[in-house]
């Protein structure tokens, strides 16, 4: 698990906001991080939308 901070634009559809902290897994292809939003749904975030904490 990787701890990261979301620094992208707030996404109300995905229920995530700038400054949210997540524990994430790296996707199989290594191009994005997989996090769970407040509803438990998988959200895929690109590497330029997050900072490793």
Enumerate the predicted regions with their spans:
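Basic/aromatic-rich interaction segments and small domains that mediate binding to polyanionic partners
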Residues: 2-48
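Short hydrophobic/aromatic patches at helix-to-coil boundaries
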Residues: 50-53
């Amino acid at each position: 698990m990787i701890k990261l901070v979301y620094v992208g634009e707030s996404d109300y559809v995905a229920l995530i906001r700038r400054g949210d902290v997540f524990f994430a897994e790296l996707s199989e292809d290594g191009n994005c991080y997989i996090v769970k939003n407040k509803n438990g749904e998988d959200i895929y975030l690109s590497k330029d939308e997050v900072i490793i904490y």
